[in-house]
Amino acid sequence: MAGSPSRAAGRRLQLPLLSFLQGATAVLFAVFVRYNHKTDAALWHRGNHSNADNEFYFRYPSFQDVHAMVFVGFGFLMVFLQRYGFSSVGFTFLLAAFALQWSTLVQGFLHSFHGGHIHVGVESMINADFCAGAVLISFGAVLGKTGPAQLLLMALLEVVLFGINEFVLLHLLGVRDAGGSMTIHTFGAYFGLVLSQVLYRPQLEKSKHRQGLYHSDLFAMIGTIFLWIFWPSFNAALTSLGAGQHRTALNTYYSLAASTLGTFALSALVGEDGRLDMVHIQNAALAGRVVVGTSSEMMLTPFGALAAGFLAGTVSTLGYKFFTPILESKFKVQDTCGVHNLHGMPGVLGVLLGVLVAGLATHEAYGDGLESVFPLIAEGQRSATSQAMYQLFGLFVTLMFASVGGGLGGLLLKLPFLDSPPDSQCYEDQVHWQAPGATLSPLPTPAFQVPGEHEDKAQRPLRVEEADTQA
Amino acid sequence: MAGSPSRAAGRRLQLPLLSFLQGATAVLFAVFVRYNHKTDAALWHRGNHSNADNEFYFRYPSFQDVHAMVFVGFGFLMVFLQRYGFSSVGFTFLLAAFALQWSTLVQGFLHSFHGGHIHVGVESMINADFCAGAVLISFGAVLGKTGPAQLLLMALLEVVLFGINEFVLLHLLGVRDAGGSMTIHTFGAYFGLVLSQVLYRPQLEKSKHRQGLYHSDLFAMIGTIFLWIFWPSFNAALTSLGAGQHRTALNTYYSLAASTLGTFALSALVGEDGRLDMVHIQNAALAGRVVVGTSSEMMLTPFGALAAGFLAGTVSTLGYKFFTPILESKFKVQDTCGVHNLHGMPGVLGVLLGVLVAGLATHEAYGDGLESVFPLIAEGQRSATSQAMYQLFGLFVTLMFASVGGGLGGLLLKLPFLDSPPDSQCYEDQVHWQAPGATLSPLPTPAFQVPGEHEDKAQRPLRVEEADTQA
Amino acid sequence: MAGSPSRAAGRRLQLPLLSFLQGATAVLFAVFVRYNHKTDAALWHRGNHSNADNEFYFRYPSFQDVHAMVFVGFGFLMVFLQRYGFSSVGFTFLLAAFALQWSTLVQGFLHSFHGGHIHVGVESMINADFCAGAVLISFGAVLGKTGPAQLLLMALLEVVLFGINEFVLLHLLGVRDAGGSMTIHTFGAYFGLVLSQVLYRPQLEKSKHRQGLYHSDLFAMIGTIFLWIFWPSFNAALTSLGAGQHRTALNTYYSLAASTLGTFALSALVGEDGRLDMVHIQNAALAGRVVVGTSSEMMLTPFGALAAGFLAGTVSTLGYKFFTPILESKFKVQDTCGVHNLHGMPGVLGVLLGVLVAGLATHEAYGDGLESVFPLIAEGQRSATSQAMYQLFGLFVTLMFASVGGGLGGLLLKLPFLDSPPDSQCYEDQVHWQAPGATLSPLPTPAFQVPGEHEDKAQRPLRVEEADTQA
């Protein structure tokens, strides 16, 4: 019970434990983390560089867009719940701020551990934000049904598995996945979905009526649009400099535009009375950038980007309409934000598209650029076909890590002392947030109501007339 | 009737037709659109460039700002309507996503069609977003009175005329218009205004009372501020590299600051009891960047930018206060967002300012920079005076294209099967969007109401007086 | 009285006076302000530069982030007040637009006045925005209790003192303060706090109940998040190119992440029933970037950044919980936004951290980079210890300028003709803004309330318990 001493004590003790988590992280930073040669005052000036050569200028603008997506985009996208806005934005803030520190360590140990130290710079900032993004995708699958302590434990585990999966794919298998269709979207989605399945709450049906407030949906659109506009930077942030980043951004731009049209088309087709559903627009329109996550750095061609984006938008919309209910009824997965439709299916499609485009790679098409997109093919160690096979194999590895990890995570989150909110408190901010005496929330009334059709039908129209006649 | 089977069927059929539109666009992309030499893996590496030379790094950060303005800025600026927020943001999203694809083709055929192909890169992304901006300006003039199918038809036509007008001005007449006072603001505004005139609805007066909700106005301010802060990037996005972009951003920055002060000054001067009007702040403060759209790349001088911005802010504010009512009563133009005040008049002023500044151009003032700002003058093909005359002529060409196009568009949009919303459903989301059982909207109550006094309508007129007399 | 002819006349006259302020500024611009050699068409092309060398490309992306923080971040952060949102965003807009022009002149005369002219470019844009930021910090201390004319007078004075203080610190004392812990945060905070003390309103207690509306807090989170994500750019905007900007952004990034965790930990620890307080999250989480404002360009080490950020987050949270009430009761300072917790204390901590890190500077740690971070030490004019002493002395100078200036400002703002809002109208938009007949505001009801239970206040305390016991 939210107000009972025991729970209060539980809450009072759990988040403060963050201090120890932060303390431990700080100690590890002290021991292992150092500036890299593009960040360190002495090392940078030792080499005889022009300042324009500093990677900062090639990657930082993209990083800032990614940073905005992680904190503004993911945070507000989840504000669509009527009385869970504080938690959606607040826990996104907390989770991402923790995940980016923790993944700086995990990814550092796996990717850039030299001479006993992790060397950090703008690339590690981008990689850490990417990992935080995967954690937030999983968060979307359990949104409203988990407390902050549970979420932090989830992040603690997921960041480690994310790093290992990424290491296996990129370094051991030589898989290409610049925009993270595999490492971020597919991994984050299925980790969260399996975890949500383990935490299945049979009595939660009713919670549905707590979703959606007119202005909450407008806040959510802030998240949608910021994710949408900056996604070209997300996919391009870590691709090869020059034409690589240029092409990646361009492909993503076209793919997103097409998925938006596909979403509107399908949403109207399947909507009641042919009306549009805001849930589709908020989410499915974003599927276009997931589907090109792997292939946007490749010679996908502008046409390929449009076709892939349109396909992703339609599939994602159909998923929200028809598959989400099945997911809950048949598979016992309560996918609060529909991450399966937004990240899961489009992610898998994106991997398959990557398999196709990689398999079609030729020296003619890439010229000397082959070295930067498919180094192993350029060096003659692999044929395009075998690269494609490795890409496909990467999908299975990712699904394996995600499922096992999500299942394990679900069991951990069931630990009794973790203060999981009771069914009656799910999707409610009040269990986690103080309501200062004067904090107010809009009075719920039916959507699109014409003033006057509220309780007292007779009086309101009058009042409006009055207001008008005064004017 | 919104819910009638016929209309429902109409809606259900129209938006899905988007799929064919998208299919046709995709086919045209497949046939004609190719990566340019800065985007293509093989072509880029063939030339022996340093990655820092890739245009991506000079223009992409500005592109991202433009992209944010188009989707966040225009979208939320139009959320000021009380129950039309879904449509304002949603249709902005749809229209812009379609327009940028379509204009990539149209502009490509006209501007960068070589060897049977359109070559795309960051410049074409910026140009496409610019064209989408013009379409959204026109959207502002018919906001709330048109359905998505009508809007898409409008975009289909407007994008073509935008491209032709732009081609005539920039390529045939050698007009300079980096920030689009002519090609974007003047064209978009008058195209939309004439179109709105053709669609005049004599019975729509009352709809006014549907405008304005406290939080809707705050959402609109999100749009205003994002448009305001990023406009220096908009004007600078396509100007010459180096000092050109630098100067353009600086001029726009000063002009915007001055137009903001001018708007507050005039809004208080003409406001009832000297109070400020949020509509003025949301819109007129932005006029400063329209007025320097043409001249911001020129040697306008910081003083010139301030003076122009201040003038634009005052003119725009007076337009909202005094001219908009006349526009509806006398000219039968129902300009929902006041695009005439925000884009029309300031756009024309901007052209005239461009005429003046171009006419004053000298080799002394521009030095070797003359080549990049006024190539025809630098090459001795034109005198500054003749360049000024061409600039002025460009205005008439633009007004001609905009008026004829807007009139034609208005007739097309009257086609009966296009599902235009009935007067009673204008400015209402419900005709276009599903209202899931739990979607809620705030209960309308008078502005600035003191809590607790909301039940009794009778006292409302009084109450405000009381509140005042307490003071 | 808001509605009385006298007040109305007062308002109607005051803001229009802005025109003269703008006119005077414009004249000064005409006489003194010129493009610098990186912005002027002739000067830039005279030197034989590659366009990539133009400072625009190194600093403009950071400038845009700073610009977004000033107008979006500060503006929306202050929307947390229930019925003061128009004024929070609107006056932020007005103040910043004036301050950046005025400070371009003041800073220009003090920093870049050569040959009778002020030379402007992207650096002056950044400096002007920084100064506007300091003015907005002071605004936060008097938010809701001052009219626009008073605020403009405050800005007029503060910008001058800001420029002088900055000149004394950076040019006379050789203090390093890239991110402005001293010049921006400490100065802005104490200037505003002393000013607020002079304007103390003993009867204002009750106004507290006007704070906080559910959606207002969500709007405020928009401000919080945009400030949070872009602060690395703020601190890095003016640091030395290359590794300097790179390192500054990285340090700020880590510090912010740690302060977020510290804030959540402490907020839960001190919150009633261990619940989180949105006020802490909105504000204290940002303290992390204030505390590294001075030292983020130095070799702070990633660990140092984490430790400093965590400390700042905890101290700031405790300030909101325990010190703000004392500040009002004992020191008669009504700090509306808690700028003492967000900018004051963290700012002073930041200065002390800078003293420490500067004192530890060695040639080994900085190598040839020492020249760009501590030129006076590199040139042998100072020892690290004496540099540290100068840093510390800079704090006292800043506090002196801020207190004297704030006191003086407070007396000026008391001038009777300045139309200060009466206590009953504090935190109310209606005194400053028109309420068009149809402008509506959400009906206030208790936070997290279950729909339908809003009428009877009696059950409200109970209700929460019930909800709990169901669990």
Curated annotation (Swiss-Prot), chains A, B, C:
The membrane-topology field of this record reads: Multi-pass membrane protein
Tell me which family the UniProt entry assigns to this protein: Belongs to the ammonium transporter (TC 2.A.49) family. Rh subfamily.
What is any one of the record's Gene Ontology cellular component terms?
basolateral plasma membrane
Give the span(s) annotated as Interaction with ANK3: 414-422
Q: Which gene encodes it?
A: RHBG
- Give yes or no: UniProt keyword Transferase: no
State what protein this is by name: Ammonium transporter Rh type B
Which catalysed reactions does the entry list for this protein?
Answer: NH4(+)(in) = NH4(+)(out); methylamine(out) = methylamine(in); CO2(out) = CO2(in)
- Species annotation: Pongo pygmaeus
Subunit: Interacts (via C-terminus) with ANK2 and ANK3; required for targeting to the basolateral membrane.
